[in-house]
């Protein structure tokens, strides 16, 4: 079996561009979103909020993102919402992974020390495109070789920050589920979600700054305590993400709704075809709205697929006894142990979902450092 390498992150990002944006260019997604942002109304007649900060260019971007996220998170359809819920918890786990790596003592690069910018781009442009490129930088960093430890006060703060990170996706879904506040509140929460990674970073740094610091912060006992906090954070995130994935899969298996079947959720369809030209299951909603749902669901499907592959690659590289930067230069086949780990990761990703499998794998990896 050929070895995994950091170069494969570029292939995954390219696949993300193809699945997210190339298809969107040909299947009418861009045109439909443009129409909605110009008219400020969805095809089903609901209004689209356009004022958030009174800064024109920023409001225009937030309006576009609100239109996108609204269609995939409202209660008008079931299947696309289920998958999008799962996707957002995988990305939430990725938020935690990069936050942990940014807190290691050996990190020197500002790009890696403050990863919020990358996670904001994941929310705004597609995690399938941005996340592989950022994790490439993480894997190629020499920070783990210099000093992989995390200060105890930072590790303690991670436990609380993990809870905050896991609450982030609820900003998108709870307003629609609750049915209160209408589109105005829902779109406001979606806009807040876009900058939530910045808020989490500020919260974490602020919390870490007020926690007491030990004089012997680098002692073996302190490092052991730090490791326990990091492992606990990863296990918590993995448990929640696995529960969300199980909810998605079980819901798809037991439902009689054809819009939420397992193949409907995870198997991409249509591709270059405009969904308006394909016979769709009657739903009582305008055909143009359902075509937009199909456009965005295809986007979400490819997002999930690429992020799943990225999480397997990332966790496998970090589980390896050799550093990712070194592995990329060697032209070897994987050892039997590494091949076994890759198989386990793949199976776990199918069963537990990408967020759960990778988080548990990274918890194991943390114990090896």
From Swiss-Prot:
The chain crosses the membrane at residues 9-29, 82-102, 118-138, 157-177, 190-210, 234-254, 298-318, 342-362. Induction: Expression is positively regulated by the depudecin biosynthesis cluster-specific transcription activator DEP6. GO terms for molecular function: isomerase activity. It is found in: Membrane. It is a multi-pass membrane protein. Its EC number is 5.4.99.-. GO terms for cellular component: membrane. Its main location: membrane. Pathway: Polyketide biosynthesis. The keyword Phosphoprotein does not apply. The keyword Transit peptide does not apply. It is an enzyme of class 5 (isomerase). Keywords: Isomerase, Membrane, Transmembrane, Transmembrane helix. Part of the gene cluster that mediates the biosynthesis of depudecin, a highly oxidized eleven-carbon linear polyketide that acts as a histone deacetylase (HDAC) inhibitor and makes a small contribution to pathogenesis. The reducing polyketide synthase DEP5 is the central enzyme in depudecin biosynthesis by yielding the backbone polyketide chain. The monooxygenases DEP2 and DEP4, as well as the uncharacterized protein DEP1, then act as tailoring enzymes to modify the intermediate polyketide chain into depudecin. Belongs to the membrane-bound ascI terpene cyclase family. This is Terpene cyclase DEP1.
